[in-house]
Amino acid sequence: MPVLGIITEYNPFHNGHLYHLNQARTITDSNAVICIMNGNFVQRGEPALIDKWARTRMALKNGVDLIIELPLIYGIRSAEYFAYGAVTLLEETKTVDYLVFGSESGNTDILKVVARILYEEPHNFKQYLKKYISQGLSFPRAREKALLKYVQQTDNIPYSVNEIADVIKQPNNILGIEYIKALFRINSTIKPVAIRRKGKGYHSHSLETKITSATAIRKGIYEQGLNSVKQAITPVTYKILKEEFENGKGPVQKQLLQHAILAELRKLTPEKIRQYEGVKNGLEYRFLEAAHNSGTLTGLIENIKNKNLTWTRIQRTLLHILFNIREKDFRILDKKGPRYFRVLGFNKKGEKLLSKIKQNSRLPLITHLKPHLKQVNRNSLNLLEKSLSYDVLSSDMYSLLYPDPSKRRGRKDFLIPVIKNI
C-alpha cells in the first residue's frame, strides 16, 4: 500500500486537519502516514500554542502514524526553505509515495505549471525578474509580476494570466507551489496532490463553523478561552489542550519573548546585524532604531514594518537574531540539506515505517539525543551537531514561555522520550 507524506504544524490539530488527513488517505489509497512537523516555533516566526510533544500526541491520537521534526533551520525560514527542508526529509525516507497538501485551489496541475516556471526560470522570466527588482520591488513582488508577464507573453501555457494570478494570491497555494518546486529541485518521484481546503480562509478569525483556520482557533483560545473553540477542534485535541493548560504548559505566553528579543537587538551594532539573513541595505538601521524606540514586541514589529517587509518576515528575522543563526550559519547548513530524522512519536504502523526507513535511508534516525549530541555546540563543524544544537536551543527558549515557572527548566530534548501510541 502507498505511504502518504504530509507537512504540517498542527498548531493546534483541528477539524480541518482531520478532514485533510481523511481525504488524503482516500484519494491516495494510503494506509500509512508520515508527518513532517515543525518543532516549538512555527514558520510564521512565532512560538507554537503548545509544545511539540503535546502536538505529537495530538497527531498520533488523530491518526498520524509517524511524526518527524522539521529542524529549526528550515522551520523558521521563508516558504521556499521551509518546503525544501520538509520535502527533502520525506524524500530521504525512501518510503513516501505521495505528498498531499491543502490549497485554496485544489488544482494540482496549475500549481505544477507555476512551480515549473519558478524552478526552471526561463530566460524571459529572468529578464522580467531583473527588471522589476531594479525598479525597487521586493523579491516576492518582483517574482509575482515577472511570472504574470511571462505567462502573458508565452503561448504554450494552458492557463490564463487571470487564473495564475488568482492562484498565487493565496498562502496555501503559494506553499503548495514551493512543495512542488522542491520536488523538482531534488528530482523526487513523490507525487504531489493538492486537496481543496474547506471552511474559512487561512487569515479568517471566524469561529462560527466546525472547520475554521488555526489562526482563528489560536486567537479564540487567547482571547476567549478553550471552550470558545471546542466546536472547531477534535475531542482528543480538546482533551490534550485542556491537560496542557491545567498543567501550566499552555497556552504559551508569547509576550515573554519580547524582553529577550529587545535585549538582543539593543546589544547589536549595524555591522553585527548585517550578518543576519535579509537585514542589509539600510534595514539594519531600521531594526536598531526600532529596538531603541519600542518597549513591546508588537511595537517593535510595527516600527520596522513597511511595504516590502511583512509581519511574518520580521518575526522570522527576530527569531534568527534571538537564536543567533547568522546568514553564514544558514549557508553552511543549507549546503548538505537536512542531516537527520528526529523522531517525535509513532504508533504500530509508524514502528514498521521506522524499520523501512532505517533499511533504506542514508540519514540517521534519532530517537535519543545523547548518542548524537554529547554537547550542545552551535559552532560545531559537524553539521548534524550544529543543526541539532539549534533545535535544543529553541526548546530551551520555548520552555521559558510556559505559564507555570516550575515547568520552565531547560534541556527538555534530552529528557522527554519519544512518544509511543502502541
From Swiss-Prot:
Primary localization class, coarse: cytoplasm
Listed under catalytic activity are: cytidine(34) in elongator tRNA(Met) + acetate + ATP = N(4)-acetylcytidine(34) in elongator tRNA(Met) + AMP + diphosphate
EC number(s) in its UniProt entry? Answer: 6.3.4.-
Q: Keyword NADP on this protein?
A: no
Keywords attached to this entry: ATP-binding, Cytoplasm, Ligase, Nucleotide-binding, RNA-binding, tRNA processing, tRNA-binding
| UniProt-listed GO biological process terms | tRNA modification
List localization entries: Cytoplasm
GO molecular function, a single term = tRNA binding
Q: Which Pfam families match?
A: HIGH_NTase1
Q: Can you list the GO cellular component terms from the UniProt entry?
A: cytoplasm
What is the superkingdom listed in this entry's lineage?
Bacteria
The residues that the entry says bind ATP are 7-20, 102, 172, 197
Q: Which family does it belong to?
A: Belongs to the TmcAL family.
Functional note = Catalyzes the formation of N(4)-acetylcytidine (ac(4)C) at the wobble position of elongator tRNA(Met), using acetate and ATP as substrates. First activates an acetate ion to form acetyladenylate (Ac-AMP) and then transfers the acetyl group to tRNA to form ac(4)C34.
The record's listing under NCBIfam families reads: PRK13670.1 (NF010191)
Full protein name: tRNA(Met) cytidine acetate ligase
User: Species name for this entry?
Assistant: Halothermothrix orenii (strain H 168 / OCM 544 / DSM 9562)
Which gene underlies this protein? Answer: tmcAL
